[in-house]
From Swiss-Prot:
Binding residue positions for Ca(2+) 2: D306, N308, D310, E317
Gene: NUCB2
Annotated membrane topology: Peripheral membrane protein
Tissue: Predominantly expressed in spleen, testis and normal stomach.
Record region (Disordered): 195-225, 398-420
Primary role: Calcium-binding protein which may have a role in calcium homeostasis. Acts as a non-receptor guanine nucleotide exchange factor which binds to and activates guanine nucleotide-binding protein (G-protein) alpha subunit GNAI3.
Top-level taxon in the UniProt lineage: Eukaryota
Domain annotation EF-hand: ranges: 241-276, 293-328
Protein name as annotated: Nucleobindin-2
Additional remarks: NEFA stands for N=DNA-binding; EF=EF-hand; A=Acidic region.
Length: 420
């Protein structure tokens, strides 16, 4: 199952089930010193959402490929570079007809989904002159030239697209967090402008008080340090801190027993530290900031420990990290409340962008209002013309009656009264 771990861990899917043929590595610990250790029931663990717009397609393709014995055996021996380079994609030519048929169907469904997205985009832009094929080429995780067949090119493109997109995923999350904080500050300042001086001072005072309350928390251990891991060992694992053993710790927290600590398994180690700073019940604690803090901690530990940069921590890498001086005597960890997310210049630039966007929206709203008013004017004009027409018809009918001429029917034919 190592191929699946490598591929999906690298792509952040982190599928945590093993092939039934593989057995978990036994954990060598003194059972007399372990408290409250309960056997974990076997269960299918759903892979987390990668955040990619083709996440479901990626998962389905991997699930189908896993059912082919030949392909699975080839990939069990693969390393990350072989998977990333696309050399293994050629093995797709040897999978069973049944598997290829399923992959073909998945691709047709994905192409159909993308075309629906494009249609929705075109409808929203009302740009009939836009080239559909050019839009389709924006999606680089499949081969558009053959929309009905899943080929080795498709697998190669899917792996490379996921690898590239997810390598930039953390950076994108940091940028989105920064925008979130700037928007928060922008909205706070805009709200203050609506208040009188007395109310404004009250709000400013409350804001400063909330900041102080949030900053008043226990010391946060440096992520990945001995103190931090020992705290997890004692409080989460229920073990004696004097018996702390890095090798045992690694095996305890390698939840799926695949020989690696993946990003989700690492992030789980920081929960106790984050709970010192963030409480969802407290008004002053922002849970969005907590997730940013978790991401920063994980990135820091990965940079320090993951020497081959494959986004996975092996037991060897983990043990080497525990031999470093920084493991025993780390620098103090600066939490987000000790940092400035943006400068005044950056906030000003962001507010200018918001103002431009608001102006564009206002222009569109004004245009729509004008169109609505014009349509209403035309409607009223048509109604007036209809009324005038009916009045003229009625006057003509009355005049004919006065002259003794039979009234005409809807088609202009004369109506005669039957003689009895």
């Amino acid at each position: 199952m190592r191929w699946r771990t490598i591929l999906l861990q690298y792509c952040f899917l982190l599928i945590t089930c093993l092939l039934t043929a593989l057995e978990a590595v036994p954990i060598d610990i003194d059972k007399t010193k372990v408290q409250n250790i309960h056997p974990v029931e076997s269960a299918k663990i759903e892979p987390p959402d990668t955040g990619l717009y083709y996440d479901e397609y990626l998962k389905q393709v991997i699930d189908v490929l896993e059912t082919d014995k030949h392909f699975r055996e080839k990939l069990q021996k693969a390393d990350i570079e072989e998977i990333k380079s696309g050399r293994l994609s050629k093995e797709l030519d040897l999978v069973s007809h049944h598997v290829r048929t399923k992959l073909d169907e998945l691709k047709r469904q994905e192409v159909g989904r993308l075309r629906m997205l494009i249609k929705a985009k075109l409808d929203s832009l009302q740009d009939i002159g836009m080239d559909h094929q050019a839009l389709l080429k924006q999606f680089d995780h499949l081969n558009h030239l053959n929309p009905d067949k899943f080929e080795s090119t498709d697998l190669d493109m899917l792996i490379k697209a996921a690898t590239s997109d997810l390598e930039h995923y953390d950076k994108t999350r940091h940028e989105e967090f920064k925008k979130y904080e700037m928007m928060k500050e922008h909205e706070r300042r805009e709200y203050l402008k609506t208040l009188n001086e007395e109310k404004r001072k009250e709000e400013e005072s409350k804001f400063e008080e909330m900041k102080k309350k949030h900053e008043n928390h226990p010391k946060v251990n440096h992520p990945g340090s001995k103190d931090q891991l020992k705290e997890v060992w004692e409080e989460t694992d229920g073990l004696d801190p004097n018996d702390f053993d890095p090798k045992t710790f690694f095996k305890l927290h390698d939840v799926n027993s695949d020989g690696f600590l993946d990003e989700q398994e690492l992030e789980a180690l920081f929960t106790k530290e984050l709970e010192k700073v963030y409480d969802p019940k407290n008004e002053e604690d922002d849970m969005v900031e907590m997730e940013e803090e978790r991401l920063r901690m994980r990135e820091h530990v990965m940079n320090e420990v993951d020497t081959n940069k494959d986004r996975l921590v092996t037991l060897e890498e983990f043990l080497k990290a525990t031999e470093k001086k920084e493991f025993l005597e780390p620098d103090s960890w600066e939490t987000l409340d000790q940092q400035q997310f943006f400068t005044e210049e950056e906030l000003k630039e962001y507010e200018n962008i918001i103002a431009l966007q608001e102006n564009e929206l206002k222009k569109k709203a004004d245009e729509l209002q004008k169109q609505k008013e014009e349509l209403q004017r035309q409607h009223d004009q048509l109604e007036a013309q209809k009324l005038e027409y009916h009045q003229v018809i009625q006057q003509m009918e009355q005049k004919k009656l006065q002259q003794g001429i039979p009234p005409s029917g809807p088609a202009g034919e004369l109506k005669f009264e039957p003689h009895i």
